[in-house]
Amino acid sequence: MNRIFLPGTYADGVPYELLRELRGAVPVCWVQEPAVGAWPAGPGYWAVLRHADVRHVLRTPELFSSHLGATQVRDPDSAAELQFTRTMMLNQDPPDHSRLRRIVAGAFTPRALGELTSAIERHAADLVGSVREHGEADFVHLAADLPVRTLAVIMGVPEQDRQLLVDWANRVIGYQDADYAHSSTADPDRLTDLGRTALALRPTTTTTPDGRPVNPRSRAALTDMFAYAHALAERPRPGSVLARMRDGGLSPAEFETMFFLFAVAGNETVRNSLPGGLYTLLGHPAQYRLLMRRPELLAPAVEEMLRFWPPVLHFRRTATQDVELAGVRIRRGEKVVVHHAAANRDETVFPDPDRFDITRTPNDHVSFGYGPHFCVGAQLARIQLKAMLHQVITRLPGLDLVPGTVPARLGSNFQNGLKHLPIQWQRSSGCGIGCGR
């Protein structure tokens, strides 16, 4: 049963068959946490696999807390690090969670997103236009630039410093996938003075004195990012998320973890969803042809992509008291982990759940969470997904995977991402939406 914990399992794909079997037999099951590499073993946790149970856990913070042990399966390395991590909005319970969410919610109103949509659509068009005549590209690399551009706009990060956002996100992914642990792609000659100062503060030590790897999510490993955030906040763009954070009465730790949440988590949701969604669509040619014939299905197609390829595989809660869930007695202080991928294939909610169907309605997936912690940027993510996929399927005729492609997946039990996705298309202009494939 500990297979669903091991990060290496997911390098071969989400184990949907195992999740289906467990969901039917033991929908709340105990999972061991063996040591992984240099990371020590953990105490184990309860995995929650049914859609209804997942929703119940997510909507009852009085029973299942985000704050007691944060929202990652593994606890931070020290009590001090846990205290810092708990200041993040993601790791708070009401009323503090509500207070933090109100500070940034104004950036995600329908009006604010409406003003941002044209810029996102323009960025998507520019990215696809930059490769259109090449006939092939790695869609992971191509798509990764869209959330970075979007975040730079809403956070007020100068264009010259955007690549820092990529490096910070990569280093956090490196917590489980070593290919990303030492990302350093920002060009010092292109950075602003703030960016160059931050780059000089980048930690170079990758192990602790006792030989354990430094947790790339820790405060010590992200000193450059936090220094940059504080410096940029001294001259924020009016109306930006950073300006709202500066003026919102946040403590220094709350400010830093909020910046982390946008710069890293806000990046990875779209960065994982776009390649995963396109890979899923191209793997179902009949559904691709249907979308080409009926472009009005793009919005429900995006929802089905999110159901089929949730960008985040799980989140953790901690029981605040002894409680029963699906007939299982959970003790106070035990870890409870909701599995989005399992809930999204629950046959009691989704008829024929393993079938990819862009006309599926309703589509009550939990890829953006549920309850108080429903993703504040969910609509922004949807706008980006629709903008990029619209450009790809209308401007890259004959789109397909490069023959023989076996996409490399992240070795992560938390993020559902691809490392590479080679795609190809016809260079000459021709068929777009409105004709077949």
Model-assigned labels for residue ranges:
Residues 1-437:
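Cytochrome P450
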